[in-house]
Design a protein with these regions (language model features):
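NAD(P)H-binding glycine-rich loop region in Rossmannoid oxidoreductase-like domains
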Residues: 41-94
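Short-chain dehydrogenase/reductase
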Residues: 82-89, 127-148
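Conserved beta-loop-beta element that borders a ligand/cofactor-binding pocket
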Residues: 113, 149-171
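Structural motif
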Residues: 2, 62-63, 108
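N-terminal Rossmann NAD(P)H-binding glycine-rich loop of SDR-like oxidoreductase domains
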Residues: 3-23
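Conserved Rossmann-fold NAD(P)-dependent oxidoreductase catalytic core, especially the SDR/UDP-sugar
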Residues: 93-138
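SDR active-site strand-loop-helix element
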Residues: 6, 30, 67-68, 109-115, ...
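N-terminal Rossmann-fold cofactor-binding loop
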Residues: 30-35, 51
Length: 171
């Protein structure tokens, strides 16, 4: 399968990309810093700069994975909060626009979200949550919700599976 990963150079992304490549998938990683990440992966992973993407490299993509976004483990100033939210929304729109412009229609779009979307009462270890559980009203819950809603634009592609990957705390 041909898989594009946006945000593949982060802690979790590196593990996912390496695992997919080891299983024989054709993996392309989109990065904002090509020079820094060119040698991050084995030779069977293509690392491509966001600003100079060659559409022919991404044609026939089966799966698009979006893991990128401003880190949340920093002081939440007004400016940082804006970056945390907008980095997720804007990158979804950029990926969508790129797909439309270049007639790339993935079968699956996997979007990284977080368990922070749930109400804080759900943080109790004795309490299970699923996609029908109560959503929270914290800043992070709102970021998760807006991030997930931003993927709705991909619904114009018939038969696409949009998957919201609600990840827990990664240490």
């Amino acid at each position: 399968m041909k898989i594009i990963v946006a945000g593949g150079t982060g802690f979790l992304g590196k593990k996912i990309v390496s695992s997919l490549a080891d299983k024989g998938h054709n993996v392309c990683v989109l990065t904002r810093n090509l020079h820094k990440h060119k040698k991050t992966f084995s030779n069977n992973v293509k690392v491509i700069d966001w600003s100079t993407i060659n559409p022919s490299l991404l044609s026939d993509t089966n799966i698009l994975i979006k893991l990128n976004g401003e880190k949340v483990d920093q002081l939440w100033t007004k400016s940082v909060k804006s970056k945390i939210l907008n980095s997720r929304i804007d990158s979804t729109k950029m990926l969508f626009d790129f797909c439309v412009k270049n007639e790339i229609i993935p079968q699956k779009f996997i979007n990284a979200s977080a368990v922070g979307i749930y109400a804080k009462e759900s943080a109790n270890y004795n309490f299970s949550v699923d996609e029908n559980s109560e959503l929270g009203n914290t800043f992070l819950a709102k970021v998760c919700l807006e991030n997930e809603r931003s993927t709705d634009i991909f619904k114009v592609f018939e038969d696409i599976d949009i998957i919201q990957l609600r990840i827990g705390v990664v240490l």
